[in-house]
Amino acid sequence: RRQRQMCIRDRAVADYRPLHVADEKVKKQDGNMSIELERTDDILKTLGERKNGQFICGFSMETENMLENSRKKLEKKNCDMIVANNLKQDGAGFGGNTNIVTLITKDDEVQLEKMTKDEVAEKIFDFILSR
């Protein structure tokens, strides 16, 4: 039986965070307020750069050009697989117990039907272990 190290990054980490954080409540003033944002560290990209034989699986949440954007992410972040979610599909993404995903590797695209998130997790593991 073959052993494999893998990393599955399934958190929707924010791409940006506030540059300045107030220590106390910000009082209402006349006019509008702007909040300056800074980019957060790209955890998945860092893992891909440091990869040493591990299988790296990331997630992609898209509202347009899902397959194209997810393939770019696969390559740019040096992942072995991206689990792509189209947030515009009914029953997919956040806020429910179901999801509809496409498993994307360099050579494959496997569209999974709508199923529970637990079932999706099992399919992801089965797919990875079959590699």
Describe each PLM feature range.
Residues R1-C7:
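Short, small-residue-biased leader/transition segments that mark boundaries at the very start
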Residues E24-K27, V83-Q89:
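Conserved positions within well-ordered secondary-structure segments
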Residues R11-L19, M61-E64, L87-D90:
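Short glycine-rich anion-binding loops that position phosphate/pyrophosphate groups of nucleotides
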Residues Q5, C79, N86, G91-R131:
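Small-residue (G/A/S/T)-rich helix-start motifs and N-terminal tracts that mark the onset
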Residues N52-G58:
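Short beta-strand/loop segments at the ligand-binding rim of alpha/beta enzyme cores
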Residues Y16-E49, E68:
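Anionic-ligand binding region
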Residues G48-N52, K76:
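Short, conserved loop/helix-junction motifs that constitute active-site signature segments
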